[in-house]
């Protein structure tokens, strides 16, 4: 049989004398079945297309499945076509709709209802773009982004897309550092007009925080209602002089306290946002944790360690028992810096001496009272002071038992047994 007869039927021969390899589509099989329905014999159809009659009978049994496959493929795949050329992935990523170039300059107005294009136009990045648009819509509804014309009225007509985006990102960074959306406007109004004092330092920000009682930005107080946590009607008005010092209308003692805390701040800027809202004000905790030392006395390491440990135990409610030994070790060392300072012996309490003054050692006594009442018990002293290695021989065990026995009868009995 001539091989050229199979060219119109999409059948190719590998070698002569072999049955031709069939590369028939479901549409070809349906056409062969239709020829049998039209009156042709299965033998003639099988000779024409080059398949056995048994295979043709199997096609007739699966006629419904073959017709369903033809409907699924569609009109483009009825014949045997070459597969489409493969395209690289970066070509799909670079294909953007032409409407993407004509975006509005103020990208805050982009929402799900104001999309200038359908998400189906994007082949790859539709999910990521929808996430970004939803984030913009969420922040816009919650008031996190301030409109550009409110803060910079002179630059209301900015048409550059990148400058607008950088401006909004700077606002977000300012809000996330240490402020709430309500305090941003307060700080903008509180900036001095003179060129000498344009920078507001961190003590001034802490003064503003302690005066206005604004809670710092955290997960807990961000979800609360801002009207509940801001009581601006009961707060006295602030008056700033030319040196940018906060002044009270009727009281002068809080001013001295605030200035003293501003000179020696107890908390850095990095630890301020880490304190959650339910804990008290850091300005109120400062005299309790670390009282102000005189200028001529050098700060000691034990005071700083005691303050840090006490603060840490307050945060965790002193629930860890192993810190009792650390408190005992801290209390055994004297807190005075010079040789003329008073020395504190922890064994004074056991020997009947007077209890040490709380003003001299505030942190050690507070740690001992907070952490463990068993810091100076017999078990702790025996486990830590008895550092000799134990001899496990028979004679040493007997001597240990005789030396540690509390009744004279047992000691006499043990000595008689040894003799």
UniProtKB/Swiss-Prot annotation:
Residues 333-359, 378-419 are annotated as: Disordered. One of its GO terms (cellular component) is nucleus. Disruption phenotype: Flies exhibit partial transformation of antenna toward leg identity. Ectopic expression causes partial transformation of distal leg structure toward antennal identity. The gene is danr. Residues 42-62 bind DNA. Coexpressed with dan in the presumptive distal antenna, but not in the leg imaginal disk. Both proteins are also expressed in the brain and the eye region of the eye-antenna disk. First detected in early L3 eye disks in cells surrounding the newly initiated morphogenetic furrow. Highly expressed in evenly spaced clusters of cells anterior to the furrow, lower levels within and posterior to the furrow. This is Protein distal antenna-related. Interacts with itself, dan, ey and dac to form a complex (or complexes) containing the RD factors. PANTHER family: PROTEIN DISTAL ANTENNA (PTHR33215:SF13). Residues 15-66 form the HTH psq-type domain. It comes from Drosophila melanogaster (Fruit fly). Gene3D superfamilies: Winged helix-like DNA-binding domain superfamily/Winged helix DNA-binding domain. InterPro entries: Homeodomain-like_sf, HTH_Psq, RD_transcriptional_regulator, WH-like_DNA-bd_sf.
């Amino acid at each position: 049989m001539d091989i050229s007869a199979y060219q119109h039927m999409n059948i190719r021969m590998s070698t002569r004398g072999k049955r031709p390899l069939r590369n028939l589509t479901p549409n070809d099989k349906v056409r062969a079945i239709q020829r049998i329905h039209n009156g042709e014999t299965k033998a003639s159809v099988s000779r024409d297309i080059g398949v056995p009659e048994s295979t043709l009978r199997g096609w007739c049994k699966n006629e419904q499945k073959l017709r369903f496959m033809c409907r699924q493929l569609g009109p483009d795949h009825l014949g045997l076509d070459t597969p489409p050329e493969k395209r690289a992935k970066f070509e799909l990523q670079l294909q953007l709709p032409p409407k993407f170039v004509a975006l509005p300059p103020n990208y805050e107005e982009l929402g799900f209802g104001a999309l200038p294009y359908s998400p189906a136009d994007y082949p790859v990045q539709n999910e990521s773009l929808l996430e970004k648009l939803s984030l913009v819509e969420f922040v816009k509804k919650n008031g996190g982004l301030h409109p550009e014309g409110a803060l910079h009225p002179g630059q209301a007509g900015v048409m550059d897309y990148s400058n607008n985006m950088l401006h909004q990102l700077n606002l977000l960074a300012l809000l996330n550092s240490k402020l709430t959306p309500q305090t941003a406007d307060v700080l903008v109004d509180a900036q001095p007009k003179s060129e000498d004092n344009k920078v507001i330092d961190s003590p001034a920000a802490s003064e503003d925080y302690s005066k206005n009682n604004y809670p710092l930005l955290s997960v807990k107080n961000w979800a609360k209602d801002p009207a509940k946590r801001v009581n601006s009607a009961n707060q006295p008005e602030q008056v700033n002089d030319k040196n940018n010092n906060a002044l009270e209308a009727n009281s002068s003692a809080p001013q001295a306290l605030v200035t003293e805390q501003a000179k020696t701040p107890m908390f850095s800027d990095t630890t301020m946002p880490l304190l959650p809202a339910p804990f008290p004000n850091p300005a109120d905790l400062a005299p309790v944790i670390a009282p102000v030392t005189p200028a001529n006395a050098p700060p000691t390491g034990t005071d700083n360690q005691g303050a840090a440990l006490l603060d840490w135990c307050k945060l965790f409610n002193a629930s860890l028992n192993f810190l009792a030994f650390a408190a005992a070790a801290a209390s055994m060392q004297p807190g005075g810096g010079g040789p003329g300072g008073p020395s504190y012996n922890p064994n004074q309490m056991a020997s009947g001496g007077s209890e040490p003054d709380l003003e001299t050692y505030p942190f050690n006594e507070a740690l001992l009272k907070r952490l463990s009442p068993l810091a100076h018990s017999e078990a702790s002293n025996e486990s830590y002071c008895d550092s000799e290695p134990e001899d496990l021989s028979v004679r040493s065990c007997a001597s240990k038992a005789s030396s540690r026995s509390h009744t004279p009868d047992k000691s006499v009995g043990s000595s008689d047994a040894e003799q």
